[in-house]
Amino acid sequence: SLRVWRDYFKNANILGADIDKNILFNDHRIKTNYVDQINPKSINDMWEKYNNIDFDLMIDDGLHTFEAGKILFENSFHKLKAKGIYVIEDVSHLYLYRLAEFFKDYNHIIVKLESSKANLLEDNNMIIIKK
């Protein structure tokens, strides 16, 4: 999906992160990094490499658990520019409202996406936070 974002945002530089070192790559306007989403030190080690860069858009398409979403947000939101957008994808209905409670003091919306496939109804939600 990183290549899709690069092609969609013609002037953007894309930064990706994954826990699977075997799928990391660098390509035209794309850099990927190893990050353990539930380890604050791992997240902050990545941000140290990009100390002078802030982001317009951040998309969490990681582990899809409450804890992982919370930890990544807590250690990454400071890298979002003013008026930037932070998106957590594929949020399960099992912890959607826990995340909503966590984000109650932030400007956020919950997007419940419908699907014709029954198995997609459980984790086809998003939380969008605007700085």
Tell what function each PLM region has.
Residues 1-40:
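SAM cofactor-binding core of SAM-dependent methyltransferases
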Residues 1-4, 55-56, 96-101:
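A generic short-segment signal for beta-strand/edge and adjacent turn/coil regions
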Residues 2, 59, 124-126:
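Extracellular structured ligand-interaction cores
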Residues 4, 21-23, 46-48, 76, ...:
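Short, flexible, glycine/charge-rich loop motifs used to bind or transfer phosphoryl groups or to couple energy/partner
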Residues 7, 44-48, 101:
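Charged/polar, solvent-exposed surface patches and flexible loops
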Residues 13-19, 53, 108-112:
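Short amphipathic alpha-helical surface micro-motifs
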Residues 31-95:
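Active-site segment flanking the S-adenosylmethionine/decSAM binding pocket
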Residues 66-131:
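C-terminal substrate-binding/active-site "lid" region of AdoMet-derived donor-dependent transferases
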